Amino acid sequence: MIQKCIALSLFLFSALPEDNIVRALSLSPNNPKSNVVMVMSDAFDGRLTLLPENGLVSLPYINFMKKHGALFLNAYTNSPICCPSRAAMWSGLFPHLTESWNNYKCLDSDYPTWMDIVEKNGYVTQRLGKQDYKSGSHSLSNRVEAWTRDVPFLLRQEGRPCANLTGNKTQTRVMALDWKNVDTATAWIQKAAQNHSQPFFLYLGLNLPHPYPSETMGENFGSSTFLTSPYWLQKVPYKNVTIPKWKPLQSMHPVDYYSSYTKNCTAPFTEQEIRDIRAYYYAMCAEADGLLGEIISALNDTGLLGRTYVVFTSDHGELAMEHRQFYKMSMYEGSSHIPLLIMGPRISPGQQISTVVSLVDLYPTMLEIAGVQIPQNISGYSLMPLLSASSNKNVSPSISVHPNWAMSEFHGSDANASTYMLWDNYWKYVAYADGDSVAPQLFDLSSDPDELTNVAGQVPEKVQEMDKKLRSIVDYPKVSASVHVYNKQQFALWKASVGANYTNVIANLRWHADWNKRPRAYEMAIEKWIKSTRQH
């Protein structure tokens, strides 16, 4: 029955005349207020949306949105980790402005989001699935690792990444929770279609294509398993899956080496292992696309597609073994470049917009669609002027209202320094900590899209220019110092709360395999760090 539903959804859009779709999406709705559906995936590499159709993985519904809406070619996360990135999207503010430092410290539970604002202005609202923008979530291990990242020890904190196959060629529902939430969302859309008098905003958060938990890691397991079924894996032309180039371990930037080690990626991998991880990840992206398709199909079936804005994006990307890492927590393209597609009323089809944008821009965009006044003190800019700027299928020029730079920051686990990225005209500048204690990196994406050559030492004048601009946006040495103080305070509070059981608890976190080789030495390293005045 599930297989039949998927096939029916695909049939609807392969059989629906293209001119009918274009006409439906361009007509002004009778109700001046349009609906909005936002689908936010987790860990979706935005570069996949830039590829030719079916080149690496079959993504029919993303391609449908590309054809009938707008694709942002340069969309970036404001923090390559779950909770802070989502806090930026919901608040419209850079993470340092809300002190969203890690997966445990984000927005307060009563923080007014853009959805709260549109609800007060007459919209019916619904949030379903993964939201993950409030403080207090994620595992104990995750937060302790984030707090202690400045301690000078090196411990593996993640399971070794692996690829697992489940089910058979007819199994479509691998991520059961996502499918359950999509079923709830489609039922909600069907019910909303019966009420034509009140517009709605629907948010749906997916878990896919985030790696699955690795329960073999013990009590405090992380997520390092790329899991899919043969049904989705057949959507990936295996011969097209590439093996990324790696620098020798001894040549890696020190923060990259720390990340590779803590992510359990410094041991040898066979080409087969790497290719499987990447292929399975792409298959997980195909399943996420199928979930998006259920939402688009529901809007089409209920006659709401023509008066609904559909947004597809992600909190961050996935490295999938690029730069000898998996997961995110990095400013490399696989981790920081996110998908962003928008289609809906009055959006010209087939647009490819080159202006660099980020998640904070969705806050004012949602408010503008809702006809609500946009606050002046936010970090983002509405994307609506860009979306209505061009009526042809060529790349739309940059609009002066929106700056042509993006900023991202990271303060969580699996990286041993606060990290800041400035993207400006295809230059990517990455600064760390206080700007002096850790060397920066600079990449020319126009000639080095794989980011294998750090040219910071070759063009010092460009480094100086980019660093000056970054400091005009964020006083990053001051922010790094604040995070350092926060980490110490929170760790001390947690240690006091654990009491006499501290030694046992800290030894059994995700790093337990390494920790238990020299437990006393690691405890002493933490004690020395707590007492130090150095602000890294």
Swiss-Prot record:
- Gene symbol here is arsk
What is the name of the protein in this document? Arylsulfatase K
Q: Has UniProt tagged this entry with the keyword Secreted? A: yes
The protein's enzyme class: hydrolase
Family stated for the protein in its record: Belongs to the sulfatase family.
Q: Where does substrate bind?
A: K130, H253
Question: Which Pfam families does this entry report, sorted A to Z?
Answer: Sulfatase
Identify the catalytic residues.
C82 (nucleophile)
Q: What's this chain's function?
A: Catalyzes the hydrolysis of pseudosubstrates such as p-nitrocatechol sulfate and p-nitrophenyl sulfate. Catalyzes the hydrolysis of the 2-sulfate groups of the 2-O-sulfo-D-glucuronate residues of chondroitin sulfate, heparin and heparitin sulfate. Acts selectively on 2-sulfoglucuronate and lacks activity against 2-sulfoiduronate.
Using the UniProt record, give the first listed, main subcellular location: secreted
Q: Summarize where Ca(2+) binds, as residue positions.
A: D42, C82, D315, H316
The UniProt catalytic activity note for this protein reads:
an aryl sulfate + H2O = a phenol + sulfate + H(+); Hydrolysis of the 2-sulfate groups of the 2-O-sulfo-D-glucuronate residues of chondroitin sulfate, heparin and heparitin sulfate
Keywords for this protein: Calcium, Glycoprotein, Hydrolase, Lysosome, Metal-binding, Secreted, Signal
Q: Which GO terms describe its molecular function?
A: arylsulfatase activity; glucuronate-2-sulfatase activity; metal ion binding
**Origin species:** Xenopus laevis (African clawed frog)
Q: What does the PTM comment of the record read?
A: The conversion to 3-oxoalanine (also known as C-formylglycine, FGly), of a serine or cysteine residue in prokaryotes and of a cysteine residue in eukaryotes, is critical for catalytic activity.
Q: Which residues are glycosylated?
A: N195, N264, N377, N416, N501
As recorded in UniProt, its EC number(s) are 3.1.6.1, 3.1.6.18
**What does the Swiss-Prot or TrEMBL cofactor note state?**
Binds 1 Ca(2+) ion per subunit.
